[in-house]
Amino acid sequence: MTIECANERLEKTRNAAHPFCVVCGKANECGLGLQFSLCDDGSVEAIFDCHEKFQGYRDILHGGITSALLDGAMTNCLFAHGIVAVTAEMNVRFRHPIKLGLPLLLKAKITARKQRKKLTAKSHWLFPKQKPKRRNF
């Protein structure tokens, strides 16, 4: 299957199964509006603009928004492979703060298929070439 066909499947599946999703749903006027696309390696990616309205602590993206975006990326990765599923378990490790005001690349990939109904996917951020500052809270 070509990337173009897979991206069409991704969009069709997302629109049918997830139209009001706060992360990627086109029918959700209050949503974040991320547009995921399939990459050559089977992962999906989207750009997220870390606007200050998504702030948690000063100048840092809220952890709940971070988690929702990571979950949405993994879901869209499944959609790109023709799989509709829900998240049964999710673990997030916050290694360093995500600064506001910078566009970030969000990626997700299926990493394991253990059984017919059990998949593992991982998602992560790619940061601009700028070392995050440590903060004392």
Report each predicted region and the residues it spans.
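HotDog/MaoC-like acyl-thioester-processing domains
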Residues: M1-T13, I98-L100, I110-F137
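Short histidine-centered catalytic/ligand-binding loop motif
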Residues: C50-G64
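Non-catalytic linker/capping segments at the edges of enzyme domains
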Residues: M1-I47, H51-E52
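Hydrophobic core residues within well-ordered beta-strands of beta-rich domains
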Residues: G42, V86, L104, K118-L119
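Hydrophobic beta-strand-centered segment that forms part of the acyl-chain substrate-binding groove
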Residues: G72-L105, I110
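Preference for bulky hydrophobic residues occupying beta-strand positions
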Residues: A46-F48, V92, S123-W125
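Active-site helix/loop of acyl-thioester processing domains in fatty-acid/polyketide metabolism
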Residues: D40-S43, I60-A85
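Short coil/loop residues immediately preceding or within conserved phosphate-binding loops
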Residues: G31, E89, T120
